[in-house]
């Protein structure tokens, strides 16, 4: 993914304003609610029977935190996302057999949560930059599938 220096600065500056743990928990929760077929990867998380159950599930929140911290680590390697996510790509491809389309879906949820949390700071320029980032991360995570 190619981001200009201005876009990189915008992304890193805005990322410093968010509660990453909350973003991760909400984004994963929204993914599981809006696209319920993704729940099959998380059946061991217990009660996912309703939107409320998903959004309040401690295992969903904990995994969302783990996911978003990996995403945040990737923000430090915007010029080499494939390298940064190589081992996670291999894990999700070879062991977990996650449909790579799910990475795009989760990226969309991250954008939605960021938009809500950042409000007017999430300008069209910021949204564009974050869309590039989540697309790059999704592509990097899908890399081992090819």
Swiss-Prot record:
Keyword set, alphabetical order: Acetylation, Heme, Iron, Metal-binding, Oxygen transport, S-nitrosylation, Transport
GO molecular function, one term: haptoglobin binding
Modified residues (N-acetylvaline): 1
Globin domain boundaries: 2-146
Alphabetical GO biological process terms: hydrogen peroxide catabolic process
Chain positions found as S-nitrosocysteine: 93
SUPFAM superfamilies linked to this entry: Globin-like
Single GO cellular component term: haptoglobin-hemoglobin complex
Pfam families to which the protein is assigned, alphabetical: Globin
Chain positions recorded as heme b binding sites: 63, 92
Tissue expression remark: Red blood cells.
Annotated coiled-coil segments of the chain: none
Superkingdom in the source lineage: Eukaryota
Positions bearing N6-acetyllysine: 82, 144
Subunit relationships: Heterotetramer of two alpha chains and two beta chains.
Protein task: Involved in oxygen transport from the lung to the various peripheral tissues.
Family that this chain belongs to: Belongs to the globin family.
Protein name, per record: Hemoglobin subunit beta
């Amino acid at each position: 993914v190619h981001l200009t220096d201005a876009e990189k600065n915008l992304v890193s500056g805005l990322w410093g304003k968010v509660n990453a743990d909350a973003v991760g928990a909400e984004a994963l929760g929204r993914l599981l609610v809006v696209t319920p077929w993704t729940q099959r990867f998380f059946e061991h998380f217990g009660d996912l029977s309703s939107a409320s159950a998903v959004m309040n599930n401690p295992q969903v929140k904990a995994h969302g935190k783990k996911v978003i911290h990996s995403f945040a680590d990737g923000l430090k390697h915007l010029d080499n996302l494939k390298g940064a996510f190589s081992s996670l790509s291999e894990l999700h491809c070879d062991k977990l057999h996650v449909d790579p389309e799910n990475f795009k879906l989760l990226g969309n949820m991250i954008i939605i949560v960021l938009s809500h949390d950042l409000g007017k700071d999430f300008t069209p320029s910021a949204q564009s930059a974050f869309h590039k980032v989540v697309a790059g991360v999704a592509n990097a995570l899908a890399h081992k599938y090819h």
